[in-house]
């Protein structure tokens, strides 16, 4: 069944004349499933090829999002505004697939070919692959921002401070099981050659960022303003991937479970560790001029990073 449900709520309230608050919440549920099968025939000069495949998959995901925003007029010269949000999204996916190739027509209904696979002549079979996978994960995120604006005098000189932060993290794990039989390739005992793989993958992630800025505006006469702004920001990112080969550690009929000694199957060549941090500064100064006929802006910005 394919399902898509969503529910939400919004709220706005004023507390007196100087403080207002707005918030929202949303919840979503998605569930999808599919079943497909395919049969192909290719007529080639070097020899005809026949193949069949089937796939069954289903997925389920949920998400919750909330946001809040507020504004506070402290006095005639000072205003504070802020907002924040939080979200999390768990998900789950499963799939089963099979495919096989032949050098002659298998002469069975392709929709039930794999159920009747043993009845197909061994002489026309080339290979067969059976695959199964399952993954689960969850991502989380929050962010907030606060800004303070202060008018310093009656001329309109203003000073502002802004602070922003966001953080996201998540973890995903997946199991994959595959078995491929090569009917034209024999092992040492004379049996059909078999390639078996059972892998576990874990992928934790984390991102964090901060931004702090200060800005200043000074009127110069009635038609011109001088403005200056400075911002500092930093961003951290971590993305790991750990892969474990379970083929020699778990029984062939066990799927989706970790044996006690699974860490001994760590595969360095299929794993990855990535960590990075970026720091940046930017300084911007400029002038604004406007009258009934003209509007002119001139600015200079500098952005060093490391």
Predicted regions and their residues:
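Primarily recognizes Gram-negative and organellar outer-membrane beta-barrels
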Residues: 1-306
């Amino acid at each position: 069944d394919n399902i898509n449900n969503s529910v939400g709520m919004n709220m706005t309230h004023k507390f007196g004349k100087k403080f207002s608050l707005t918030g929202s919440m949303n919840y979503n549920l998605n569930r999808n499933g599919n079943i497909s099968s395919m049969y192909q025939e290719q007529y080639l000069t070097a020899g005809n090829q026949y193949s069949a495949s089937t796939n069954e998959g289903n997925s389920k995901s949920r998400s919750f999002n909330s946001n809040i925003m507020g504004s506070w007029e402290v006095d005639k010269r000072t205003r504070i505004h802020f907002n924040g949000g939080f979200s999390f999204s768990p998900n789950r996916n499963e799939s089963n697939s099979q495919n096989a190739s032949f050098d002659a027509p298998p002469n069975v209904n392709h929709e039930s070919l794999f159920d009747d696979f043993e009845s197909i002549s061994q002489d026309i079979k080339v290979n067969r692959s059976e695959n199964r996978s399952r993954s689960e994960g969850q991502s989380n995120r929050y962010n907030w921002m606060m800004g303070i604006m202060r008018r310093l005098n009656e001329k309109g000189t203003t000073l502002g401070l802004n602070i922003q932060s966001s953080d996201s993290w998540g973890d995903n794990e997946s199991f994959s099981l595959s078995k491929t039989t090569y009917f034209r390739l024999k092992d040492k005992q004379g049996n059909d050659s078999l390639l078996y793989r059972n892998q576990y993958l874990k992928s934790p992630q984390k991102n964090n960022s901060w931004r702090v800025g200060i800005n200043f505006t000074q009127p110069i006469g009635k038609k011109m303003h001088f403005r200056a702004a400075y911002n500092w920001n930093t961003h951290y990112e971590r993305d790991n991937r750990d892969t474990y080969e379970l083929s020699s550690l778990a029984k062939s009929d066990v799927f989706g479970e970790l044996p006690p000694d699974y860490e001994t199957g760590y595969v360095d060549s299929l794993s990855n560790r990535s960590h990075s941090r970026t720091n940046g500064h930017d300084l911007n100064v400029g002038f604004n001029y406007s009258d009934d006929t003209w509007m002119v802006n001139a600015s200079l910005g500098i952005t060093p990073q490391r």
